[in-house]
Amino acid sequence: GYSEEENRADPQALADMLQVIYACSKPTVARVQGDCYAGGMGLVAACDIAVAAEGIEFCLSEVKLGLIPATIAPYVMRAMGERAAHRYFLTAERFSAQEALRIGFVHELVSGDELDAAVARLTHHLTAGSPHAHDECKRLLREIGGETIDAALIADTARRIGEIRVSPQGREG
């Protein structure tokens, strides 16, 4: 058994790691080459972009083990959407890479042999962008996702583009 302290430390370590990945100022790409279960789905969901090999399966298996996917839930729910999360959190059924693509959990499916090339192509596009713009873009995505489009949000987004246009990186680009 675990001590109470150990019981809290282990999930906290996973939560901290997922937050570091999610909040990283650099774009992150998940390369999924084999079946992806439970905490592995949290790792994929915490990344900005996910590319997976065709033919693999995904599963949020926690309820079959008497657990809940609490630590990974914020990331997985954002990646797959709330309705899909209801289904897959509660049923713990395996689903295909094609289904993961359909629900938006992954962005692209390729054959296993093409996985490295697909990731290389994405990283080529990413490295063409400004690191400062990537950081600000990621901040924008985190902060306005799910917000109501109202006058305050419109003013905030206008302020953001105005600020980055006059930054050294914005003037250079």
Residue ranges and their predicted role:
Residues 1-20, 36, 148-149:
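Glycine- (often His-adjacent) and acidic-residue-rich active-site loop
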Residues 18-65, 94:
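Glycine-rich beta-to-alpha active-site loop
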Residues 27, 44, 100, 137, ...:
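Terminal peptide-recognition signature
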Residues 37-38, 69, 82, 170:
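Functionally critical, cavity-lining and gating residues within the transmembrane helices
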Residues 51-56, 106-154:
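C-terminal long alpha-helix characteristic of the crotonase
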Residues 74-83:
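Hydrophobic, secondary-structure "cap" segments at the distal end of domains
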Residues 84-93:
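Short helix- or helix-capping micro-motifs
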Residues 88-89, 137-141, 161:
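Short alpha-helical scaffolding segments that buttress acidic/His motifs in well-ordered protein cores
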